[in-house]
Design a protein with these regions (language model features):
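Short, acidic, metal-binding catalytic loop of nucleotide-sugar glycosyltransferases
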Residues: 23-32
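Glycine-rich, basic loop-to-helix element that forms the pyrophosphate-binding segment
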Residues: 62-80, 90
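Short aromatic/hydrophobic "clamp" motif used to bind/position activated sugar donors
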Residues: 85
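Acidic donor-binding/catalytic loop of UDP-sugar-dependent glycosyltransferases
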Residues: 44-45, 92-105
Length: 287
């Protein structure tokens, strides 16, 4: 018997994207799955009803409070009935079956705790966003998506263990949630998937990149590429992340100093040159 995948996605004022993602799944994905949409307190209270009316076979859960990225996914997980869970951004597009490749990778080794597919841009399908991740610097608290902004010319066709999954698509076994827990909700937005990957690895499990599965991502569709929201939470959550993962006090202090001096001044300079003065207060708010 084939074990089902529960696909969990969050809708927040993103009805058009959510509809396009679900329709692309319906057209291209044949592996057994259920779809759970968490409406994260969209400002239009009818969005969840419109989704349920258009797609009567999916579950639509309305939260009256915006629970953030982790909280919304955790709510969806509590309704899931599948053996596997796929946390999938609503601003993604599917053009070919991909669930079987993710499932096969998860099942290939009991040590594998989480798998992300190859992720490319939409509509620039030949331009990559993710083919794995570099380790994170303990000082800058930054890492890089392998292959980011490169043309996909077949150079990333080998599955491999990697440092972090990509928050746009993360597959796990439902039973493993008991081992490494759900996503931490106090971040609200950004860094929660990095924290979650760290917790997964602390249990002895590994993170993998699977190139046989590919999806396309309209990056930052819900919050904007350089919105005040993004600037605030990135700044704030780096400091929270440092507090949680850096066990050595000296390294943690060095990271704090870097974030609140060099990184802050660099961002202020960039926003000044770009005449994006309205973003500068959100840097200080995050600190």
């Amino acid at each position: 018997m084939i074990k089902k995948v529960s696909i969990i996605t969050i809708n927040y004022n993103g009805l058009k994207d959510t509809v396009e993602m679900i329709e692309s799944l319906a057209i291209h994905e044949t592996y057994p799955h259920e779809i759970i949409v968490v409406d994260n307190a969209s400002t239009d209270p009818l969005e969840h009803k419109l989704l349920q009316s258009k797609f009567p076979d999916i579950q639509v859960i309305r939260s009256e409070k915006n629970l953030g990225f982790a909280g919304g996914n955790n709510l969806g997980i509590s309704y899931a009935t599948g053996y596997y869970l796929l946390l999938l951004n609503n601003d993604t597009i599917i053009t070919q079956p991909f669930l079987k490749a993710l499932v096969n990778r998860l099942d290939s080794n009991p040590r594998i705790g989480c798998v992300s597919p190859k992720i490319a841009c939409w509509p620039e399908k030949e331009r990559l966003q993710y083919a794995g991740s570099t380790p994170m610097s303990h000082i800058t608290l930054r890492n890089t998506s392998i292959g980011y902004d490169q043309l996909d010319q077949g150079q990333f066709e080998e599955a491999h263990e990697t440092s972090f999954a990509h928050g746009a698509a993360m597959a796990v076994k439902a039973i493993d949630i008991q081992k490494f827990g759900k996503m931490p909700e106090f971040y609200f937005l950004y860094y929660e998937e990095l924290d979650w990957c760290t917790q997964i690895q602390k249990t002895g499990s590994s993170i993998w990149f699977e190139p046989k599965a590919i999806i396309y991502h309209k990056e930052s569709a819900s919050v904007g590429i350089e919105s005040p929201l993004r600037i605030y939470y990135h700044t704030r959550n780096r400091l929270i992340f440092a507090q949680r993962i850096l066990s050595k006090k000296r390294i943690r202090i060095c990271s704090y100093i870097y974030q609140t001096t060099f990184a802050l001044c660099k961002k202020i300079l960039i926003f000044t040159i770009q005449a994006k003065f309205h973003l500068i207060p959100f840097l200080f708010k995050g600190i």
